[in-house]
Amino acid sequence: RGENVRPTVSIYCPSLEQRNSGSASTVCLVDKFYPGGAQVTWKGDNKVISSGVDTSDKIKDKDNTYSMSSTLTMSSEEFKYSTMTCEVTHPTLTPALAKSFQTSECTF
């Protein structure tokens, strides 16, 4: 594959069912990018969060682009940020691409 492809980024709230069980996992999906050098940074209220992060290896798709996911898990007590952000850096992104949600919106 010759041309660079910008990733699409999606972020998902932890489910209410999971939060009620004592933990909260927020997922960031990074899809369809090339070349493979994408990185994910998690932020809570614009502060970098490094503990509880599990980022998958990138997976090569049939069209020779890559996809990956990153999951941030914390206890329900720690899930007190008002804004959660997944920030993706990639050679095609200047500046980095950030997707966020307000934790008050995570009611489903």
Curated annotation (Swiss-Prot):
The keyword RNA-binding does not apply. Disulfide bonds join 13-106, 28-86. InterPro entries: Ig-like_dom, Ig-like_dom_sf, Ig-like_fold, Ig_C1-set, MHC/Immunoglobulin. SMART domains: IGc1 (SM00407). It comes from the Eukaryota. SUPFAM superfamilies: Immunoglobulin. Residues 7-102 form the Ig-like domain. Gene3D superfamilies: Immunoglobulins. CDD domains: IgC1_L. Keywords: Disulfide bond, Immunoglobulin domain. It holds the Pfam family C1-set. This is Ig light chain C region.
